[in-house]
Amino acid sequence: MFLELINFLAQFDAGFNVLNYLTVRAILAMLSALFFSLMLGRVFINQLQQYQIGQIIRTDGPKSHLIKAGTPTMGGILILFTFMISVLIWGDWSNIYLWIVIVTSIIFGTIGFTDDYIKIKHKSSNGLSFSIKFLTQSLGAIVISTWIVLISQDSIQTQLLIPFFKDTMLPLGIIGFLILSYFVIVGSSNAVNLTDGLDGLAIMPVILISGALAIFAYLSGHYNFSSYLNIPFMPGTGELFVICAALIGAGLGFLWFNTYPAEIFMGDVGSLFLGAILAVITILIRQEILLFIMGSVFVAETLSVIIQVSYYKRYKKRIFLMAPLHHHFEKKGMSEPKIIVRFWMVTLILVLVSLASIKIR
């Protein structure tokens, strides 16, 4: 939004051109989102408390969680709002990737908001039915995946990049690309949702992964860097650098209030939209495999639920004391802060491993 104003002012003073630089806009986007989050966070929490919009705790969960009952939830609205405002201020409105991310955020944020609203209205831990939730997520994923295919200008954009190997890309074709994108979007959205069970557990991995994706987006969108590093050049993806920076700022601002002991939870409105936009950004820069690596904490949480449910249905026994995985460790007596920090550490290590793929190939 400011780019037009900046270009106009640059006609009178060339110094304004510095605000056109991608790195400058990314820094300003991150700082703006962080500032908005910190300024609005306390007011937002007070409003949630006033209207008694609090977390509903499962009675069959860890007993230590009962004290969290009534903690303000739907904090994902704060993340979504500050993220989108920052992106719209500092982003390039002529870049189609910006609008793909914005629309994805709105679609999955709306699904999550509806789910949270039903839980609060009925004072139950059950929101949307599984079938409706899965159907709406699927429709959203199909729409976004199809949109990405329609704007693809090069066959590279429908190939799967294999990290750590030089010039290795797997042709998917349009159908293969749509199928992969569908599973990445729906899977990532639900994985972050399942992980969001402890204070700050989900948001820090999202921040760390966003940081890595910002680097990959910047390199992929820069012809000289991508050529030197032997990374496929994808024009326009550099704008995702600004978007990732805004997400980092919004995430850090939320973590200020969400860190243990949390003053607010993100709810499904936050987790579903965060997982979805991580997936979409990854798809746009063709780094799906690296998302799987960096997001292994999310993957492990999801697999623990799938394994637990499948095994119980077949043998009427449980493999884990409780699923998702973080609850299993709680049941074993590990403190919540220790679980959270260790999951953060695992994510940080895997993010660094993924970043190593820039040079190791």
UniProtKB/Swiss-Prot annotation:
Q: A Gene Ontology CC term for this entry?
A: plasma membrane
If you read the UniProt record, what top EC class would you report for this enzyme, in one word?
Answer: transferase
Enzyme Commission identifier(s): 2.7.8.13
This protein's membrane topology, according to the annotation, is:
Multi-pass membrane protein
Reactions performed catalytically? UDP-N-acetyl-alpha-D-muramoyl-L-alanyl-gamma-D-glutamyl-meso-2,6-diaminopimeloyl-D-alanyl-D-alanine + di-trans,octa-cis-undecaprenyl phosphate = di-trans,octa-cis-undecaprenyl diphospho-N-acetyl-alpha-D-muramoyl-L-alanyl-D-glutamyl-meso-2,6-diaminopimeloyl-D-alanyl-D-alanine + UMP
Q: Give the domain of life.
A: Bacteria
Q: Which GO terms describe its molecular function?
A: metal ion binding; phospho-N-acetylmuramoyl-pentapeptide-transferase activity; UDP-N-acetylmuramoyl-L-alanyl-D-glutamyl-meso-2,6-diaminopimelyl-D-alanyl-D-alanine:undecaprenyl-phosphate transferase activity
The prosthetic group or cofactor this protein requires is: Mg(2+)
Checking Pfam families in the record gives: Glycos_transf_4, MraY_sig1
The metabolic or biological pathway listed in the UniProt record of this protein is: Cell wall biogenesis; peptidoglycan biosynthesis
Name a single GO biological process.
cell division
InterPro entries for the chain: Glycosyl_transferase_4, PNAcMuramoyl-5peptid_Trfase, PNAcMuramoyl-5peptid_Trfase_CS
- What is this protein's function per UniProt? Catalyzes the initial step of the lipid cycle reactions in the biosynthesis of the cell wall peptidoglycan: transfers peptidoglycan precursor phospho-MurNAc-pentapeptide from UDP-MurNAc-pentapeptide onto the lipid carrier undecaprenyl phosphate, yielding undecaprenyl-pyrophosphoryl-MurNAc-pentapeptide, known as lipid I.
| NCBIfam families, per database record | mraY (TIGR00445)
Q: What is this protein called?
A: Phospho-N-acetylmuramoyl-pentapeptide-transferase
- Please name the source species: Ruthia magnifica subsp. Calyptogena magnifica
